[in-house]
Amino acid sequence: LKNLTLAKLKATSGQKSKMKSVQNKASKSKIIVLDPGHGGVDPGAIGRQGTYEKKIVLMAAKTIKKILVQTGRYEVVMTRKSDQFIALRKRVAIARRAQADLFISLHADSIKNGAVRGATVYTLSENASDKEAAQLAERENKADLISGIDLNAESQEVTDILIDLIQRETMNQSAVFAGAVVQELTTKIKTHRRPHKFAGFAVLKALDIPSILLEMGYLSNIEDENLLNTKSFQKKLAFALLQGLDQYFFKGQSFRN
């Protein structure tokens, strides 16, 4: 059954890929969703010098968007453009509605140890996501859960297998993109000693959209806090993401910007 289901998934995914390929050729750009974390009543972390995470990540998102869009290779959708609260599930829904090719959530960490600093890239862990996938399958309309693949007519067993296969591929692609971003970050800014980690963040749980969460630095570290407030640092982050995106989507090609 699993082999038959995999064959069916590949056939359906092939049709979806062809449709998306035509769309991409027409638009000549990849769709990136930038998700500035927190906002509104949720300030996120607060730095030792009073910096609000929700403000820093919004500033960074606007800088990143400008640099990505200027290349002509990327179309950028932001989950929020102002200081407003957006529920986690709605952030994922925005990405799915935009038919995003990649989802990037921006944050600035805070912990008790003020000596720890550097950027970290998170992707979804398999253990965390398996349980979440099952819960989503029960709660959500199956046709809405995985864009482009209608599971309404399928048995629960087939549905579970399809979701598992799609989720694993999405997680693999997320890890590939994370690796490209980490490679670029380490040449431009200070990164955590373990720059790629895995965790069960809710905003990373879109089954069909490769996603990363970028902790840009630690607001609990004064040096990081000062850097996060500067345009120059935000531009370094932006160019690291740009080059990571170029590596992921256009491997082997070289660009001037």
Question: What are the functions of these language-model segments?
Answer:
Residues 4-158, 167-179, 239:
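Catalytic-core regions of hydrolytic enzymes
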Residues 162-257:
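Active-site-adjacent mobile loop/cap segments within catalytic or ligand-binding domains
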